[in-house]
């Protein structure tokens, strides 16, 4: 969180932000069943009159906003929620914290990653509609599908569109102050950008810190597309569980931090800091054991399974034959993260 926030932001709920979040999180669209949220998001993007808007062959949504001369920044989040997200949830807010209920019991909220979707639209509202954020440059926006089952959407997206970017920001991290710059020994941003980001956070009075985190579409963008990337906290906790919740103040704080980044990223970019490939930094360690919880999409209601990778061995439990195609895709994404001479793949 920012250290010098005003008192009002701590005591008054941002109703506009709450309503925007509820608009997206209320839509039931788990992995493999994202038509409803895709239709809503595409319509909302189109209403902003972007210079370009399209869906790629997998169904990911992309848009471009030309905002004058300057650098090119890519903003992204994913549209799907985990496959076990319940239908007919009721979204409630109490004291600035948002929960989901189904039949009077706590349920998966889906802030992972509808909070990220909300953050991007709030930034676009400031830049394109209200014009209160004087960003100069080009904004590329992507909403990826099926991140929750192995970053499938981003791995099948329009690489050429994203590769126009000088830098990419993913909005898909739990907590309130993480700048994820790598995962499981794989860097998202180079050392120079990590140092600049950490210094910038301190200079502007924020508590955001460069850390190693979990898997997100930032992995695909950095390692498959070669773009220096980060993944920012957006204020959700206990994701993928019935105890999931979102802290609105923390989401709002991330939007403020991201807005300041957008106004200042031209500095490291013009200094050439993003020209170095995003493959090493001092934050991430060596590749380590990795476990992936595989969950089926909605149309395989009776299936579930676990893929675990420990001490160089892959174990697959409780999978039936109908999940093999999706399992293979998930394993391919995991395999790309590992060193072939360290892990024994079977």
What is each PLM-predicted segment?
Residues 281-346:
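Positively charged, low-complexity terminal tracts
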Residues 23, 27-70:
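A non-catalytic alpha/beta surface segment that caps or lines the substrate-entry region
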Residues 105-109, 113-191, 210:
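Acidic/histidine-rich catalytic neighborhood of metal-dependent amide-processing enzymes
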Residues 2-33, 240-241:
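N-terminal capping segment at the start of a domain
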Residues 209-254:
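Zn-dependent metallopeptidase/amidohydrolase metal-coordination segment
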Residues 46-49, 64-65, 69-138, 148:
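Active-site metal-coordination/substrate-binding segment of hydrolases
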Residues 238-290:
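His/Asp/Glu-rich mid-to-C-terminal helical/loop segments that flank catalytic regions of hydrolases
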Residues 52, 133-138, 205-211, 266-277:
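Flexible, glycine/charged-enriched surface loops at secondary-structure junctions
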């Amino acid at each position: 969180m920012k250290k010098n926030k005003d008192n009002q932001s701590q005591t008054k709920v941002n109703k506009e932000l709450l309503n925007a979040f509820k608009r997206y999180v209320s839509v039931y669209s788990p992995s493999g069943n994202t038509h409803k949220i895709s239709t809503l998001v595409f319509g909302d993007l189109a209403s902003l009159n972007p210079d370009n808007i399209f869906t790629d062959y997998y169904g990911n949504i992309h848009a471009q906003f030309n905002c004058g001369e300057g650098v090119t920044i890519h903003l992204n989040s994913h549209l799907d929620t985990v496959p076990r997200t319940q239908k007919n949830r009721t979204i409630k807010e109490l004291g600035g914290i948002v929960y989901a209920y189904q039949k009077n019991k706590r349920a998966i909220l889906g802030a992972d990653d509808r909070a990220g979707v909300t953050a991007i639209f709030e930034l676009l509202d400031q830049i394109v509609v209200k014009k209160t954020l004087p960003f100069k440059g080009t904004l590329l926006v992507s909403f990826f599908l099926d991140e929750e089952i192995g970053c499938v959407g981003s791995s099948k997206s329009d690489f050429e569109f994203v590769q126009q970017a000088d830098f990419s920001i993913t909005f898909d991290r739990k907590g309130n102050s993480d700048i994820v710059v790598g995962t499981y020994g794989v860097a998202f941003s180079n050392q120079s950008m990590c140092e600049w980001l950490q210094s910038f956070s301190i200079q502007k009075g924020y508590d955001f810190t460069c850390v190693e985190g979990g898997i997100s579409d930032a992995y695909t963008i950095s390692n498959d597309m070669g773009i220096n990337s980060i993944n920012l906290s957006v204020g959700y906790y206990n994701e993928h569980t019935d105890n999931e919740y979102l802290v609105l103040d923390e989401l709002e704080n991330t939007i403020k931090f991201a807005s300041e980044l957008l106004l200042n990223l031209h500095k490291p970019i013009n200094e050439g800091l993003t020209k170095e490939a995003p493959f090493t930094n001092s934050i991430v360690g060596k590749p380590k054991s990795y476990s992936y919880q595989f969950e089926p999409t909605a149309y395989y209601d009776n299936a579930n399974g676990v893929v675990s990778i420990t001490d160089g061995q892959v174990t697959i439990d409780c999978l039936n034959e109908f999940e093999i195609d999706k399992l293979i895709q998930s394993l391919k994404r995991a395999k790309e993260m590992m060193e072939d001479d360290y892990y024994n793949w079977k």
